[in-house]
């Protein structure tokens, strides 16, 4: 039996685990902590920090792995690409390309050089230079760590006082101690997940992103996006341009973009599965298993039977269950108004568990199907509620 090294086993990695089992790999999984949701479905667990490239490289060598599968985290992407390059394993872009795509400062420099439609960004490695830049720039601005995901460390600023605090905060969150500062674009945020084969887009899943409790962490995704054919065409052209320049390998290429009256602006790209169990509604929308095909790509297996240009159908969404304060969970109650739309759910926490970062710590997810776009937005957006978790101090 061939061996696969999977870098983590969170709820977001369950689809990768299912795919590896379907492909009959012996699954060795790593992670900082034991007991994650997917660990029990794997064959072997080695407690190790998957962001430590040299440590994971030693594990890969000692276990004679045949393939490596990244997890739902950018640091996992770095490590998987690094090890694939060192050991000659299939399925990954070269390490330098991975760094370009998954570091905001490197990607923005690449975008500027190659005329990719992305906000102009300035990078900094010290607080003084960053603050001086803000002081002579027009507000509002947005300040981000270069190497964080899920909205970590990001803040909009409207004056010098806010800028100073946000710069300190972003540097605290960045492992690399680098940040970027950009003009704030006022528009609607969307996701555009594509699958590449031979550097061409052969499938897409589109969604609108909504953030209520935390403006920088997506809370609700609705599928498909409210999007014109022109916007879709522009984004496909941009992705294929990036893929051609960087000679990207097959597999998922996801981007987030903000659209205003001037069109779409690409704010972030990534080559991995998405958080918030994104593939659950995406699979239903597209009629195929995104995680399965992504796993085949990362394992270097044939994609000859990939369902190219498969039509999407239906209206789907996920809603993140969040607490409204820190403390201990008293009870979790799914609102009755969601029952008629509910197709699945996944809980990460239970009564008695603690919540320390309520604005960014998911309690679970609801997966829903609607009969129309209008119904979906009415129930989830226009009539938004966040009262399914009762807390005690």
Regions found by a protein language model. Name each.
Residues 1-96, 128, 301, 312-313, ...:
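ATP-binding N-terminal substructure of ATP-dependent carboxylate-amine bond-forming enzymes
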Residues 98-180, 186, 198, 222-237, ...:
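Active-site nucleotide/adenylate-binding loops and adjacent lid/helix of ATP-dependent enzymes
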Residues 155, 183, 283, 364-371:
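Short, well-ordered beta-strand elements within core beta-sheets of diverse protein domains
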Residues 158-159, 194, 321-325, 366-372:
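Short beta-strand-to-loop capping motifs
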Residues 170-178, 183-225, 233-266, 270-278, ...:
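Phosphate-binding core of ATP-grasp and ATP-grasp-like enzymes
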Residues 253, 264, 338-351:
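A structural supersecondary motif
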Residues 282-294:
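Gly/Ser/Thr-rich active-site loops/lids in small-molecule metabolic enzymes
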Residues 299-340:
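A glycine-rich beta-turn/hairpin centered on an aromatic-Pro dipeptide
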């Amino acid at each position: 039996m061939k061996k696969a090294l999977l870098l983590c086993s969170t709820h977001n990695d369950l689809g990768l685990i299912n795919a590896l089992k379907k492909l009959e790999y012996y699954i060795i999984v790593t992670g900082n902590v034991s007991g994650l949701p997917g660990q029990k479905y794997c064959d072997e667990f080695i407690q190790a920090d998957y962001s430590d490239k040299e440590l994971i490289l030693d594990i890969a060598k000692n276990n004679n792995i045949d393939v490596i599968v990244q997890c739902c985290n950018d640091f996992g992407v770095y490590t998987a690409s690094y090890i694939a390059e060192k050991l000659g394993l299939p399925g990954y872009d070269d390490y330098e390309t991975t760094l370009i795509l998954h570091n905001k400062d490197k990607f923005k420099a690449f975008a500027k050089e190659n005329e990719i439609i992305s906000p102009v960004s300035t990078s900094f490695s010290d607080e003084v230079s960053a603050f001086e830049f803000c002081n002579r720039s027009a507000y509002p601005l947005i300040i981000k760590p270069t190497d964080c995901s899920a909205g970590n460390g990001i803040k909009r600023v409207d004056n010098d006082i806010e800028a100073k605090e946000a710069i300190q905060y972003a540097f605290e969150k960045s492992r690399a101690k680098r940040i970027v500062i950009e003009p704030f674009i006022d528009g609607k945020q969307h996701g555009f997940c594509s699958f590449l084969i031979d550097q061409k887009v052969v499938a897409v899943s589109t969604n609108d992103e909504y953030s209520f409790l935390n403006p920088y962490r997506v809370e609700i995704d609705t599928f498909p996006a409210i999007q014109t054919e022109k916007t879709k065409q522009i984004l496909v052209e941009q992705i294929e341009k990036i893929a051609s320049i960087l000679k990207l390998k097959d597999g998922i290429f996801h981007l987030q973009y903000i659209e205003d009256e001037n069109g779409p602006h690409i704010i972030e790209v990534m080559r991995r599965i998405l958080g918030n169990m994104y593939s659950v509604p995406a699979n239903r929308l597209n009629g195929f298993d995104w995680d399965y095909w992504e796993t085949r790509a990362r394992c270097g297996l044939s994609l000859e039977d990939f369902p190219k240009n498969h039509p999407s159908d239906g209206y789907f969404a996920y809603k993140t269950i969040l607490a409204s304060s820190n403390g201990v969970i008293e009870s979790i109650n799914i609102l009755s108004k969601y029952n008629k739309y509910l197709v699945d759910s996944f809980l990460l926490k239970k009564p008695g568990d603690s919540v320390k970062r309520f604005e960014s710590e998911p309690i679970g997810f609801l997966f829903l199907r609607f009969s129309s776009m209008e119904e979906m937005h009415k129930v989830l957006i226009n009539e938004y509620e966040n009262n399914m978790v009762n807390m005690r101090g």
